[in-house]
């Protein structure tokens, strides 16, 4: 490996660059808006709910079933406490980053930033937990079904709340 790279940092930089490319390709594949965080909520208001649903499932499958991202996720999980850079990457890719992303999406639907954050936690928390459940499960199909049910139920509750507000 070191014949092709000058050291660990160059290897990590290449891995992160590949992950960024994969993220961009998936966002484009699912036609998700590419905007700055302040524009997320407005951009997502025009995206069909089924598209957000499909993208969320694709994200989960990306982090669990695709070999490169799944190994990257597991590596970050193990190394997050040993190396500050790995901890930062873990937070950006798997913890705080996705929660902030979802909170930005929910800001226009919520009465406050705090409520948007609660929606984001309610949406992403089970998905985050299911990464670990999936890794250890002998019946991974059931885990995917649980995630599917969670996302559909969350969307139904969000839509019902939106109708009540009108």
Residue ranges and their predicted role:
Residues 50, 64-110:
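Amphipathic alpha-helical packing segments from all-alpha helical-bundle domains
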Residues 42-65, 70, 74-78, 117, ...:
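Amphipathic alpha-helical segments that line or abut small-molecule/effector binding pockets
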Residues 2, 8, 13-17, 61, ...:
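Feature detects amphipathic, helix-rich regulatory segments
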Residues 88-92, 96, 105-154, 165:
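Hydrophobic/aromatic-rich alpha-helical bundle segments in the mid-to-C-terminal region
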Residues 3, 10-54, 58, 89, ...:
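Alpha-helical structural segments
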Residues 23-27, 67, 84, 127-138, ...:
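Short amphipathic alpha-helical interaction/hinge segments
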Residues 58-63, 83, 109, 130, ...:
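Alpha-helix C-capping/helix-to-loop hinge sites
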């Amino acid at each position: 490996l070191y014949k092709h790279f000058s050291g660990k940092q160059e290897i990590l930089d290449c891995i992160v660059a590949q992950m960024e490319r994969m993220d961009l390709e998936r966002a484009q594949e699912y036609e998700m808006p590419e905007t700055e965080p302040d524009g997320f909520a407005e951009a997502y208001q025009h995206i069909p709910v089924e598209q957000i649903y499909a993208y969320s499932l694709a994200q989960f499958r990306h982090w669990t079933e695709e070999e490169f991202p799944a190994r990257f996720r597991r590596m970050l999980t193990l190394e997050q406490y040993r190396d500050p850079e790995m901890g930062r990457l873990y937070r950006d890719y798997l913890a705080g980053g996705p929660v902030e992303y979802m909170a930005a999406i929910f800001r226009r639907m919520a009465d406050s930033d705090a409520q948007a954050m609660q929606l984001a936690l309610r949406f992403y928390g089970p998905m985050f937990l299911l990464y670990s459940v999936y890794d250890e499960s002998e019946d991974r199909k059931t885990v995917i079904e649980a995630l599917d049910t969670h996302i559909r139920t969350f969307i139904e509750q969000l839509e019902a709340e939106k109708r009540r507000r009108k």
